[in-house]
Amino acid sequence: MFEISLSDPVELRDADDAALLAAIEDCARAEVAAGARRLSAIAELTSRRTGNDQRADWACDGWDCAAAEVAAALTVSHRKASGQMHLSLTLNRLPQVAALFLAGQLSARLVSIIAWRTYLVRDPEALSLLDAALAKHATAWGPLSAPKLEKAIDSWIDRYDPAALRRTRISARSRDLCIGDPDEDAGTAALWGRLFATDAAMLDKRLTQLAHGVCDDDPRTIAQRRADALGALAAGADRLTCGCGNSDCPSSAGNHRQATGVVIHVVADAAALGAAPDPRLSGPEPALAPEAPATPAVKPPAALISGGGVVPAPLLAELIRGGAALSRMRHPGDLRSEPHYRPSAKLAEFVRIRDMTCRFPGCDQPTEFCDIDHTLPYPLGPTHPSNLKCLCRKHHLLKTFWTGWRDVQLPDGTIIWTAPNGHTYTTHPDSRIFLPSWHTTTAALPPAPSPPAIGPTHTLLMPRRRRTRAAELAHRIKRERAHVTQRNKPPPSGGDTAVAEGFEPPDGVSRLSLSRRVH
C-alpha cells in the first residue's frame, strides 16, 4: 500500500527551497497514487455493469450505464467518463505497469499514452512481454515530450506485436475544423484546422474579397474584417455588412444576407439589451494612456449562446444593431398544464431556456439537442413546466429503461437524482447561474402515484445496436491491425523493376540504378 506523509501548509512557510520541492514531488506522487486507485474502482464498476449480455445490443448498454454513474460521481460529461473507463481497463491488461502507477512512480500522462499506444495489442503473450518491458524501462525515461514517449513505447510494441502499431493518418485524412472554448470576457473563440490546399486558397481569397467590400469609414482592420467575413459566410451572406453606421453608406445598399437554415439562439437578461456598443471592439490597438479611464463598478449582465459561450453586453448590442431578431420570454406564471404528451412550442421554449443543458449530473449537452422528458411519466405526470426537463437522448434512454435511476423535480426546476447505488445528486437549471434575476419557479404539482415499473410487456422498446459494443471494438481493432500488417509487408520481389521517371529519393537516401530485365 502506498503511503505518504504530507506536510501541513503552515509548516511549509518555514521550510527551505529543497524541502518545498520535495513536498511538491511527494504531493505529485500522492495525486498519482490516488488517481490510480480511482481508476481501479472505475475498472471494477465497469466490469460489474458490463457483465449482462442480454442488454449488450441496447443503444444504451451496460457500458453507458456505468459511464452515467462515473460521470455523476466525478461531475464530468458522459464522454469523459467513458474515457476514464477505457483508461481504467489498462490496469487490468498491464498489471506490472498498473503496480507502478498505484505506487505513484508513473504519471497519469504516461499511463494514458501507454494505454493509447498499446490499444491494439490483444495477444496475451505479447501483452505480458510488453507489460514487463514497459514496467522495467518506463521509470527511467524521464521527462520526455509526448512524441518521444510514443516513439519509445512503439519501439517495444514493434518488437513484440508489430501489427499493433497505431497508424498515423496522412494529412489529407486529418482534415478538420475545430472551434475552441469561448473567451467569456471577449466573446470570441479560437478556430483552427486543416483543409485541402485548393479549398484553403479559395477561402483565403473570398475572405479578402469580402473584407474589401465595405466603405473606407468601416472602423475594423482588414484582419478583423476577414474574421467577421467568415461569420457572414456561415450566415449565408453574399457581402460583409459595413460597420461605419452611416445612413448613406454605399456598401449598405441592397440585401446583404440570404436566408439560411442556421439559427443561433442567444439568451439574455432584459437589462443586457440596453447596453451600448463598445467602439473598442474593432480597429487598431489603442495607444497606451498614462492613466486608464475608470470603468463602471457594475457591468451590464452578459448574454449566453445556447450551447456555447458568453456574449458580453457590448457585443450583444452590436448583434442587435446588425438586425438580430428579439423574442421576449413569457413569464412562467403564464404557463399551465397542457392536455397533450408533447408540449407546445412556447412551453418547450421555456423549458429549454430554463435548463440550457441536459439535466443529468455532469452532462453539458445543449438543450437544442435534447429531448423534453416528463419527470413523472405521462399521463400520471402532467405536461407542465414543473414536471418537464431536458435530457439528452442517452440519458433519456438511461432513465426510461435502466430503472435504477430515479428523479424528483421541484417547482424551481431543481432535479434530485438517486443513483442505483443510493447516492443522490442535485442539479439546478443553468439559467439560475447565467440569468439569476429571471424567476423560473412554476406552480407546485399535487402528489401523484408512483409510476409503474418497466417490465417485459412495456410498450416502449429500447433502440438496438447493429453490433454490440464488444463486436464493434473487435471489428475496429481487426481492421486497424490488418492495415498495419499490409503497410509493413515487404515490397514484392522479382518481376519488372525500374526507376520511376522523375522520382527523387528523400534526403539522406541513396538512389539506386536498377536495370530493366529483358525477357
UniProtKB/Swiss-Prot annotation:
<dbReference type="GO" id="GO:0005886">
    <property type="term" value="C:plasma membrane"/>
</dbReference>
<protein>
    <recommendedName>
        <fullName>Uncharacterized protein Rv3776</fullName>
    </recommendedName>
</protein>
<dbReference type="InterPro" id="IPR003870">
    <property type="entry name" value="DUF222"/>
</dbReference>
<feature type="compositionally biased region" description="Basic residues">
    <location>
        <begin position="477"/>
        <end position="486"/>
    </location>
</feature>
<dbReference type="Pfam" id="PF02720">
    <property type="entry name" value="DUF222"/>
</dbReference>
<feature type="region of interest" description="Disordered">
    <location>
        <begin position="477"/>
        <end position="519"/>
    </location>
</feature>
<dbReference type="InterPro" id="IPR003615">
    <property type="entry name" value="HNH_nuc"/>
</dbReference>
